[in-house]
Amino acid sequence: MVGAGQVILIDPNEERLKTARENRLAGEYLSVTGQEAAEAVKGLTEGRGADAVIEAAGTEASFTLAWEAARPNGIVALVAMYEKDPVLPLTRMYGKNLIFKTGGVDAADCRELLELLREGKLITDFLITHRGPLSQILEGYDTFEHKKDGCIKWVVTAE
């Protein structure tokens, strides 16, 4: 993460956590979830909480963890696709003054990201675990959605 002082990665899936460790995606790796994870983040940040949180799982529990782990005035970036809208428990959030950012890839940053990829400064090859032609897209999406065979990303190839 460019410019990040400390990166804490949380994932209850041991296989994904192993992949993250092997590719040195963070300085700290946690397999705990919920309140235990939020408390662990506070412990690793001298009680402050995270300056910024990227929520990429898309569950009610991961959304709750994201805002609970963030420090007051922190940023919570929601990049996951939620099946249903998360509930904002405003009475519990009151006083945190959080900044929420939503959405997928910002086209304004694509040039910078492509340059980092070209220069070899951003390595993403390990994320592509499965490939297949467009004619198998439904099978590929099913594999991706249900994380079959350790799928992280399924990429469409030329037929």
Regions found by a protein language model. Give the residues of each.
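Adenosine-nucleotide cofactor-binding segment
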Residues: M1-F63
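Conserved acidic E/D residue at the C-terminus of a beta-strand in Rossmann-like folds
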Residues: D11, A80, G104
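Alpha-helical segments flanking ligand/cofactor-binding loops in enzyme cores
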Residues: K18, T64-E68, T91
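Conserved beta-strand scaffold positions in the cores of enzyme catalytic domains, especially
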Residues: E28-Y29, F100, L127, R131
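C-terminal hydrophobic helical "lid"/dimerization subdomain
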Residues: T64-E68, A107-E159
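Helix-to-beta-strand junctions that scaffold the AdoMet/dcAdoMet cofactor pocket
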Residues: A70-P72
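Short glycine-centered segments of the SAM/dcSAM-binding site in methyltransferase folds
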Residues: G74-I75, I99
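Rossmann-fold NAD(P)-binding glycine/threonine-rich loop
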Residues: V79-N97, A108-E115
